[in-house]
């Protein structure tokens, strides 16, 4: 009789065994259980505090009556609306269960052992998970130093130097999460133009809607010029649909074809498809939410700086604060006040905290609790 296997998890491949799982922001329900609090605000996961468009909510309510049916696996209706809005062909769009899903699809389709993917230090935590799971090699380039014009942001020169014949993907979030920092459009476009043809540039634009007036790119407008560019966006942030998980990639049609070969069937729910299609049409709702976030970004940052807290430049709906050696203690103190923010020690930034911009009232409550 063969010996009994006491830990079947050890059967997993080595590159998965060595992974650290993604840790999301602390849920409200968890804090309720732990501290017995009821008046809680969550400023941890960069969600839209105004929620989804009323049109999206109504569309999703109607779609609930169809949940006994599989969704349209091609997502044709949503892709058609996206194609019209973005000025691209339907065949250039791939839908995902959030843009995280699309990051994983890119890795599955274009990486394998012996190949490399590049991303910057302090880049989004899903990049290493997606890369390492394929057995490919992650090449992490140093970020800008703390005293630079865009501290802790992407160093494009370092990323360019890291490209080799084995490189297949360069991941760049602009603006970056968790830092909020960004690369101006001219510098980023020059970088993309210099990337060799055997390398895909995965341009993560999850916070695209919040970047107006700061000189960032509209990556979709570059696709005709750069066939190796893949632009990723989401309905989770400005559109307020984080809970139903809908994202999309826009790329050359041949890249979309490869992504669809590894995409799981029916990866976006019938409720998500309906909500996203309706949300896309309610431009006033998105514009109003973005306007508040951008205004609050400036107000909250100025207040914090005036009170002695260093804040990184941000083009997203969040701010990265330098909280010092007591960052964990300050996070815990905020929890006791019923405010959830995001520690980023797992990014190698143990002295920082990331704070989502909520409603003005929520932000005032945070600022009051933050005062020493």
Feature names for model-found ranges:
Residues 145, 294, 298, 303-337, ...:
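Conserved PLP-binding catalytic core of the aspartate aminotransferase-like
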Residues 62, 66-116, 134:
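Phosphate-binding glycine-rich loop
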Residues 132, 149-165, 178-201, 205-238:
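Active-site pre-lysine segment of PLP-dependent enzymes
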Residues 109-172:
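PLP-dependent aminotransferase-like
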Residues 333-337, 341-342, 346-372:
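PLP-dependent enzyme catalytic core of the Aspartate aminotransferase-like
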Residues 2-69:
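N-terminal "arm"/small-domain region of PLP-dependent enzymes with the aminotransferase-like
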């Amino acid at each position: 009789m063969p010996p009994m296997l006491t830990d079947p998890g050890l059967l997993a491949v080595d590159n998965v065994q060595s992974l650290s799982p993604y840790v999301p922001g602390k849920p409200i329900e968890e804090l309720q259980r732990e501290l017995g609090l009821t008046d809680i605000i969550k400023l941890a996961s960069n969600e839209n505090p105004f929620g989804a468009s009323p049109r999206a909510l109504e569309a999703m309510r109607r779609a609930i009556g169809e949940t006994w049916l599989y969704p349209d696996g091609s997502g044709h209706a949503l892709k058609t609306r996206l194609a019209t809005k973005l000025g691209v062909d339907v065949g250039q769009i791939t839908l995902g269960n959030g843009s995280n899903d699309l990051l994983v699809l890119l890795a599955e389709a274009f990486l394998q052992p012996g190949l490399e993917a590049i991303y910057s230090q302090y880049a989004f935590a899903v990049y290493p998970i997606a890369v390492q799971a394929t057995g490919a090699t992650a090449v992490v380039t140093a970020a800008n130093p703390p005293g630079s014009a865009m501290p802790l942001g992407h160093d494009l020169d370092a990323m360019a130097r890291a490209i080799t014949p084995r490189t297949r993907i360069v991941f760049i979030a602009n603006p970056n999460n968790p830092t909020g920092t960004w690369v101006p459009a001219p510098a980023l476009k020059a970088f993309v133009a210099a990337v060799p043809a055997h390398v895909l540039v995965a341009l993560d634009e999850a916070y695209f809607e919040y970047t107006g007036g700061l000189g960032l790119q509209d990556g979709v407008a570059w696709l005709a010029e750069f066939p190796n560019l893949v632009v990723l966006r989401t309905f989770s942030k400005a559109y307020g649909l984080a809970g139903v998980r809908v994202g999309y990639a826009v790329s050359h049609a041949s890249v979309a074809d490869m992504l669809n070969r590894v995409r799981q069937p029916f990866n976006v729910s019938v409720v998500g498809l309906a909500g996203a299609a309706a949300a896309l049409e309610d431009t006033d709702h998105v514009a109003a939410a973005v306007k508040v976030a951008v205004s609050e970004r400036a107000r909250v940052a100025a207040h914090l700086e005036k009170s002695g807290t260093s804040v990184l430049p941000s083009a997203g709906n969040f701010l990265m604060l330098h909280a010092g050696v007591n960052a964990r203690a300050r996070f815990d103190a905020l929890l006791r006040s019923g405010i959830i923010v995001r520690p980023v020690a797992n990014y190698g930034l143990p002295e920082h905290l990331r704070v989502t911009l909520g409603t003005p009232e929520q932000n005032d409550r945070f600022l009051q609790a933050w005062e020493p």
